[in-house]
Regions:
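Extracytoplasmic
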Residues: 4-367
Length: 367
């Protein structure tokens, strides 16, 4: 979690498809090939623990994956760029005193001083300027070199939501709201949008002066923060719960329960992730065998890695709560659909980084 009693929970698509009907909170190509020289003499045909042979990021990790992971962040001074085109500085933008605007064909470079050699993540806070409604794409270079395939295809999502309330026609069928962009400040790590790697990309930097370059592939964006970030290892559940102060986070209301319907999501990463309906099961809420009642979200449209749906929930006090998700994956027989759970933008522990939904025609409740 980058430093910066309402809790926002986001589920991110990783592999195929799942449907979410209820969210219950309980207590308790611009193809670039300048990375080829980096692997001159290296056997790129060797398999890497089952990873695709043409994935140069796998080879990159073979070369640098055992390097140190320094603990300090390196903040990039956005306005001290050394080279730029399609860039402008804006003041008083969406609550920020000063920001950097990138056009859809922009390119900007900064010189950064890295205190310690090792592996780092790249973290960004951006505002998705309204344009054509597609994901924002960027390429990232270190010292003029694309480190690996995938660093030239970084995707940053937009934010969508409902324009209006659910309406009914004269037959009692519910009409889903129109989807509109609801841009807001977003935070993200540079990562593989295809989902082959669920963790953020790890970039290797030598200590001393380095030049980093951020290049637009499509769509404009506004940036308020860019960080060469220390890699925080995600704890397992045992480590996570052991670190919780049980005296501070002690629930007084042990009977608390809150149900949030899946179709009542607040924000989404794509306009196709709207509320829809299922009339095949009486376990859905609301249910009608004859009329259209919006009682789920996702479905066949929720199949692209990195797509997310967000719900806002409010809990009465700091404490430990259980989260249950009612979902169904009945589209791909023999496949497992995985989802990650984020609380306030953070995956709390490893076990919720890939929650599996196996093929089944029945809805299942996972806690």
């Amino acid at each position: 979690d980058m430093p910066g009693k309402k809790k926002k929970v986001i589920l991110i698509s990783v592999i195929v498809i799942a449907l979410i009907v209820a969210f219950i909170v309980y207590r308790k190509l611009n193809q670039v090939d300048n990375y080829h020289d980096k692997y001159a003499g290296y056997d790129l045909d060797s398999d890497v623990q089952g990873v695709s042979r043409d994935s140069t990021y796998a080879k990159y990790l073979l070369l640098y994956g055992e390097k140190a992971k320094p603990s300090a962040n390196v903040e990039v001074d956005l306005f001290q760029y050394t080279d730029a085109s399609g860039i402008s500085v804006m003041e008083g933008y969406e609550g920020e005193d000063k920001v950097l605007h990138m056009e859809d064909e922009a390119k900007v470079s900064w010189q950064v001083d890295i205190p310690e050699t090792g592996l780092y993540n790249m973290y960004i806070e951006y505002y998705p300027v309204e344009s054509r409604g597609v994901d924002i794409e960027r390429a990232f270079y270190i010292n003029g070199v694309l480190p690996f395939a995938g660093s030239d295809d970084l995707a940053f999502s937009r934010v969508w939501g409902d324009k209006n309330e659910v309406r009914e026609d004269n037959q009692g069928n519910e009409i889903r709201p129109t989807q509109v962009e609801l841009p807001r400040w977003q935070s993200a790590y540079f990562k593989d949008y295809m989902g082959y790697y669920t963790e953020p990309y790890q970039y290797y930097f030598e200590a001393g002066a380095n030049t980093i370059t951020f290049e637009a592939v499509n769509e404009p964006m506004v940036i308020r923060r860019l960080v060469i970030a220390a890699i925080n290892e995600q704890p397992d559940y045992e480590g996570y719960i052991a670190a919780v102060d049980k005296n501070t986070y002690k629930n007084s209301d042990t009977a608390f329960e809150q149900k949030v319907q899946g179709e009542d999501s607040t924000f989404r990463s794509a306009p196709s992730l709207y509320a829809t309906y299922d009339r095949s099961s009486a376990t859905t809420e609301p249910y009608s065998s004859a009329k259209i009642k919006l009682n789920m979200i996702g479905g066949q449209a929720w199949k692209v890695s990195g797509q997310w749906i967000e719900w806002e929930v409010t809990v009465p006090e700091d404490g430990l709560y259980e989260i249950s998700i009612k979902g169904r994956q009945n589209y791909q027989r023999g496949f497992v659909s995985n989802r990650a759970v984020y609380i306030d933008g953070v995956i709390p522990f490893k076990e919720v980084s890939a929650i599996p939904f196996k093929y089944d025609n029945a809805w299942e409740m996972l806690t």
